[in-house]
A protein has these predicted regions:
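Phosphodiester-processing cores and adjacent nucleic acid-binding clamps
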Residues: 1-208
């Protein structure tokens, strides 16, 4: 059993061509491990949310509905360069019904307004629909990790401050360790940025 740990960064079969977890098996395995809650954060979609919620209710586990959204490097309307086709990852988790409504709106607008290779949101939308949401900095494909991998520590501090302006105390820096060299390289810098900005840390697994 794993007590005191909750998976907050989890992909299912609805992360198409990426996730291998089946929702039923995912929830039942979490229960077997003695976990009281589990999140679902598929890439850019919320297709599995209802099945996930119902399965969690059936198994007596708290369902944390979320999404790993794609954030446009510039704005969601910029669709002309290769960089626009490489959006940053960002994990959003619903705190309450308002958060669920706002996340649903963000995911919808990612498709209807921001789609360019991927459904993309931008900072303007995040500011508009931030209420009721918890934000995690995501994996090595997140903007914070990419900034640190580029060696831009000062820019990383500025970035975290910008996200804290949007999400306040509901913004967390993710720490992951899967034996990937890039993760190990930026880990001390993530800790430094967290200390310098007073940002809380959260340990996650990028579960697929």
């Amino acid at each position: 059993k794993v007590s005191g740990f909750v998976h907050l960064h989890v992909h299912s079969e609805y992360s198409l061509l990426d996730g291998a977890c089946r929702i039923r098996g995912l929830v039942r395995r979490a229960k077997e491990m003695g976990q009281t809650a589990v999140a679902l954060t598929d890439h850019g979609v919320m297709y599995g949310s209802i099945d996930f919620y119902n399965e969690c209710v059936e198994n007596g586990i708290k369902a944390i509905i979320g999404c790993e959204v794609y954030v446009a490097p510039r704005t969601r309307f910029d669709k002309s360069t290769k960089s626009d086709m490489k959006p940053h990852h960002l994990v959003l988790l619903c705190k309450d019904n308002e958060g669920y409504k706002n996340l649903s709106k963000l995911v919808t607008l990612g498709y209807t307004e921001g789609f360019y290779n991927k459904p993309r949101v931008d900072r303007e939308l995040l500011r508009r629909y931030s209420k009721g949401l918890i934000c995690l900095s995501a994996c090595i494909s997140g903007e914070l990790a990419r900034t640190l991998l580029d060696g831009r520590l000062a820019d990383a501090v500025t970035l975290v401050k910008e996200y804290r302006e949007i999400f306040g105390e509901d913004y967390y820096i993710e720490l992951q360790s899967h034996g990937i060299s890039e993760q190990e390289r930026i880990l001390p810098y993530l800790l430094r940025v967290a200390k310098d900005t007073g940002t809380q840390l959260v340990a996650t697994n990028d579960a697929h």
